[in-house]
Amino acid sequence: MDELLILPRHSGTLEGTVELPLNKSLANRAQIIAALYPHLTLNTIPEAEDSRFLAQALSSAQRDLYLGAGGTTLRFATAYWATQPNTLKVLSGTDALNSRPIAELVDALNALGADITYEGRDQHPPLRICGASITHSSLAFGTLKSSQFLTALLLIGPALPKGLSLTWESLPSRSYVEMTVAMMKELGFDITLDKNSVTIVPYTAATPREITLERDWSALAFWCEAAALSTSTSLFFPGLQPHSLQGDFKVLDYFEPLGVGHTFTSDGLQLTKNSTLAYGKLVYNLEQCPDLALALITTCFALRQPFEISGLSTLPYKECDRLQALVDLAEELGISVKATDNSLSSISYPEKLAPLGPQSSREDHRLAMSLAPLSMLMPLSMEHPEVVAKSYPDFWKHWDQFS
């Protein structure tokens, strides 16, 4: 794909079938589980770059492992290789990945008995990991910065000789930890999650079984955004069902007041364009599903819908500073907003949104996909659209079928 994508003004009609990618969060958890526990197998790996890089990192005999731009990939691979005695690995990624925080996980693993050091800048990748036999079995945290750090520990917990016991005072994005625990329980692990603690019993061999994966609810958010901005929508998504391990399943509830209807069938989910139901100000807390923030807030911008959305404290630490990206987009559209460390609120909207100049994806897959539906309102151009390959490689192919 060319580095600059031109999106002409969209017709506003969406009708057809979209096969969403497999959820990379579940897939990456499943890869670690399959690597650590031989009776569990994973026969399907998504095409998402994050998942492919993790697969390579888990199977490679090379010392130096390149992990692309995936924060989850780095954190899970770090935990895995830390538990593999008599191995030496150096993990690194893109400049953006090497700038993302990792110290909380490294400190936790080292406290358990791992041997991890920094090759370059302190508290950042590249990481030098000398695989070790983990000897300790308990840790206490204050306020955790990322649920992914905790999830990485949960995945290796059953492989430790004494299991693992963790406590904490505060945990962001708890829904992702709940997803991990539910997945592990479903696969037969003995794990107990309470409000501020989790206990994992050492793994014992069980009946062989294959791990199955769900379609990605977070990817649906961008089609919900498109439906909300469309004049007519009838989209079918095979494989999405009303019961899911993913917290992002709540996307349907968040978009319903913005005119997005849905119906489940035995085969999947039907999205439709309904009358916009919202009145007054939309007030949401997205702490448990921050990956929905870009699509949801961009939709509010486009519809000039008043909103107050909190639970955004992790947005600055994603692939880009997503909170700042939203503030910048609002300014370009002529929208006045108020941002705090944890929230974004609309103050006033112009009578007509200002046209947008060339947009940068900022190396963020979700930012790129959240910008695409704005072409329902105006022509759009975007630099480096190929970044969507991180989680949804076929996004532009799917988008083009409705252009």
What positions do the PLM features span?
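Short, structured segments at the rim of ligand-binding sites
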Residues: M1-S403
